[in-house]
Amino acid sequence: MKKIYDLDLPTMPENGVPSNTVIAIDGPAGSGKSTLAKQLADTFKLLYVDTGAMYRALTWAAIQNKVDFSNEDALAQLLAQSDLTLDSGVKSIVVRWDSKDISSEIRSSDIEANVSEVASHAIVRKEMVAIQRNISRSTGVVMEGRDIGSVVFPLADVKIYLDASVETRAIRRHKQLSKNDSSCTVQNVQADIIRRDKLDTERKESPLTISPDAMIFDNSNLSISEQLKEITSIVLFVIERSLPKLPEKQLPIATQTLKYKFAVGGMNTLLRFMGGK
Ligand code: DC
């Protein structure tokens, strides 16, 4: 008789997570998603995917090709005809458009000002989501963005919604942006963050929302290392609790969802308790 555990179980390193684990991280601009996502990917040996960089790359290409930001068909065509790649570099990811390294260009204030409009189009998002899902076919991922838990991976193993006060986020973003642009001020950056939050949360297509089964985490008063420590143990806790006795795919979806909701409900209560709320 064939033993059930001989079926395709993912590899599971000691004190780690299965190699096909999907961790979705969503949250507004400047909430620290990239830092956290990179650290978690490193810790759990998963692939880090920055989906904001993909929308930024398309915005860069639109500028180069003089494509109007409101022309969704032309934008989608530009994306379909391109070779967009993200590679893990030593400290950050390397973004290439048709082999050209555009990693620093996509962080400029010009891109910052227009990327929300580019990301608001349904056809563009459809193509991006297809690319993002495709990446996870061959590997586990830590993917960060605005719609990862809600649209890209509604059945992600762990969903985190990362947040921080708008003042904290503005100070963080200003620190990054002022490296390339000495004229930017915290006030300007804060005004731009408020404008982008509004566009990202109020747009029709896949707006930034908190999935009901996401763990909400406010890191305004936490250091990066404190955050990593807390979230690493939360991820391990959730994964261990939801690890199936049978391969996950054999469990009815309702059972998976129930188990996950139970773990997330408990974690959100714990987080509120730790945050004194
Ligand atoms: O995270 P970021 O600042 O690099 O994102 C750039 C823009 O892309 C941001 O305005 C929202 C948009 N975005 C999105 O709509 N969906 C995603 N999954 C990721 C980013």
Segments predicted by a language model, with ranges:
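Extreme N-terminal, non-catalytic leader segments
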Residues: 1-22
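Small-molecule kinase domains that catalyze NTP-dependent phosphoryl transfer to phosphate-bearing small molecules
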Residues: 10, 87, 132-139, 146-151, ...
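Hydrophobic anchor at the beta1->P-loop junction of P-loop NTPases
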Residues: 25
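P-loop (Walker A) phosphate-binding loop of NTP-binding proteins
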Residues: 28
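Conserved lysine of the Walker
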Residues: 33
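Hydrophobic positions on the alpha1 helix immediately C-terminal to the Walker A/P-loop
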Residues: 36
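N-terminal phosphate/diphosphate-binding loop that engages ATP/GTP or pyrophosphate donors
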Residues: 43-107
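ATP-dependent NMP and nucleoside kinases share a basic, alpha-helical "lid"
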Residues: 103-180
